[in-house]
């Protein structure tokens, strides 16, 4: 096992995380005129747009990061391990104070210093633990060796959406217990 591939995964995930946060802030700033113009629309419309921007920027930057690793002949498992470590560290920050997962997922109070509620951030990070390795593997095995084809891209995103629906269903089931 080469430490450079693991370190690349760790650093790449940090860079992707910062870039995605910057894109989210830009999306929020760009949507301000529309919020004032379309004031009568529910907040869900603007939230859905922000989440879509977040997911697209995350997927796009990971595409370039995985493509670089593929071209540098790194091993996929080592890159995934490095990115997994950073995700696990971020999730562990939520659990350090002794809160249960159910308490964290029920905390939709955004009165603190964060832009988004802690539950939303925790769920995004938890879903990324499952979705990110799948996305990286699909890119590595399906898209990068064969070139970028729309058919393959739709196949990858279809698989990810199916997994996401299952994760949301499992979360709702967990919260109802």
Curated annotation (Swiss-Prot):
Q: How does it sit in the membrane?
A: Multi-pass membrane protein
Tell me the compartments it is located in: Cell membrane
Keyword terms: Cell membrane, Membrane, Signal, Transmembrane, Transmembrane helix
Gene Ontology CC annotations of this record: plasma membrane
Query: Does Transmembrane helix show up as a keyword for this record?
Result: yes
Which N-terminal stretch is annotated as signal sequence? 1-29
Assign the protein's first listed, main location to one coarse class.
Answer: membrane
- Asked if the Swiss-Prot or TrEMBL record annotates the protein with the keyword Secreted, the reply is no
Protein origin, superkingdom: Bacteria
Where, by residue number, does the polypeptide cross the bilayer?
45-66, 79-96, 111-135, 153-171
* UniProt protein name: Uncharacterized protein YwdE
